[in-house]
């Protein structure tokens, strides 16, 4: 069953152009996505919208005109959008996700990653909405992988600590919420700097200059569209089964260091990789990282939830507009 509302569209006919008011179908399943302007949020919004959900996204600095502008630190603004829209599901993607930024701005990061998350969980519980809180593999110390949902977290850096505190705030304020821990993400970026994976592309392309690449930390690069699919499938199963709640893990299954990712990127585009230099020492600059925080995803797999895009395919789809001789296409496709 769907609702209906009016929408204006432009109709072109030979010799004429007119503005026409038409009725459009509005799906009755409603989802609110925070951080909808970000890499993951955009994918989550698109996934729900394309699968018969009425999706509303909210952001802050980059919100207009596509999304609602909401300051998640403003409890009144959060209350109003949730009560006005009455979502069945809320996917909370908004976060400060850069470990080094969190170390340098701990109070601001804690407000967004912890305080805002707890308040959102409280508001979701008040209207009976299912909240999916996006967390991180960085809640683990990386010494004993793979990690199951019930394993005891031990974050090494402040980012991981704020995400863990955010998990606690969510589950304390909303017993029916879900926590979804995920690893490093990539996908259709607007800028290469939007992902720790895609940011390597310039170093790969500029083969006339050697580049040091980390070959110590083991990562599991995961496409945002796969995480978005997991969020939708989890939401749809929850609408049929209220026992679906608690903590879940999702991750790609290809283990790679940044050096190995860079070499795979070079291979995908038939570019040289001899200028890339593997560095096997533990990084000494920036926030401490877990060496291998591999996530065990069997709980979601048992529910029949999940999909995985092979890295070579996903990274080629994501990066081809950023080839040096194709960057003009960004104005068209991004």
From Swiss-Prot:
Pathway: Amino-acid biosynthesis; S-adenosyl-L-methionine biosynthesis; S-adenosyl-L-methionine from L-methionine: step 1/1. Disulfide bonds: none annotated. The keyword Phosphoprotein applies. NADP(+) binds at residues 37-40, 60-62, 71-72, 93, 97, 159, 185. Pfam families: RmlD_sub_bind. The gene is MAT2B. It comes from Bos taurus (Bovine). GO terms for cellular component: methionine adenosyltransferase complex. Residues 319-334 are annotated as: Required for interaction with MAT2A. The modification Phosphothreonine is found at residue 309. GO terms for biological process: one-carbon metabolic process; S-adenosylmethionine biosynthetic process. Belongs to the dTDP-4-dehydrorhamnose reductase family. MAT2B subfamily. Regulatory subunit of S-adenosylmethionine synthetase 2, an enzyme that catalyzes the formation of S-adenosylmethionine from methionine and ATP. Regulates MAT2A catalytic activity by changing its kinetic properties, increasing its affinity for L-methionine. Can bind NADP (in vitro). This is Methionine adenosyltransferase 2 subunit beta. It comes from the Eukaryota.
């Amino acid at each position: 069953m769907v609702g209906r509302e009016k929408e204006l569209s432009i109709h072109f006919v030979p010799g004429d152009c007119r503005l026409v008011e038409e009725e459009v179908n509005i799906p009755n399943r409603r989802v609110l996505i925070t951080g909808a302007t970000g890499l993951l949020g955009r994918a989550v919004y698109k996934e729900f919208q394309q699968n018969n959900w009425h999706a509303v996204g909210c952001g802050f600095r980059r919100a207009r005109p596509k999304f609602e502008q909401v300051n998640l630190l403003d409890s009144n603004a959060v209350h109003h959008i949730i009560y006005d829209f009455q979502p069945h599901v809320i996917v909370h993607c908004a976060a400060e996700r850069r470990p080094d930024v969190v170390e340098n701005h701990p109070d601001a990061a804690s407000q967004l990653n912890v305080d805002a998350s707890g308040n959102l969980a409280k508001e979701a519980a008040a209207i009976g909405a299912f909240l999916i809180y996006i967390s991180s593999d960085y809640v683990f110390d990386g010494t004993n992988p793979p990690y199951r949902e019930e394993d005891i977290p031990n974050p090494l850096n402040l980012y991981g600590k704020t995400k863990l505190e955010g998990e606690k705030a969510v589950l304390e304020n909303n017993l029916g919420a879900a926590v979804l821990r995920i690893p490093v993400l990539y996908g259709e970026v607007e800028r290469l700097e939007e992902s720790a994976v895609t940011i390597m592309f310039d170093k790969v392309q500029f083969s006339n200059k050697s580049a040091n690449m980390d070959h110590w930390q083991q990562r599991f690069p995961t496409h945002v569209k796969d995480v978005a699919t997991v969020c939708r499938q989890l939401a749809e199963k929850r609408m049929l089964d209220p026992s679906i709640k608690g903590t879940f893990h999702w991750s790609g299954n290809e283990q790679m260091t940044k050096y190995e990712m860079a070499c795979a990127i070079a291979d995908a585009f038939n570019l040289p990789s001899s200028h890339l230099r593997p560095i096997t020492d533990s990084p000494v600059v920036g926030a401490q990282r877990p060496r291998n925080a591999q996530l065990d995803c069997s709980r979601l797999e048992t529910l029949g939830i999940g999909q995985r895009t092979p890295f070579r395919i996903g990274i080629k789809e994501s990066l081809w507009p950023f080839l040096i001789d194709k960057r003009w296409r960004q104005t068209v496709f991004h």
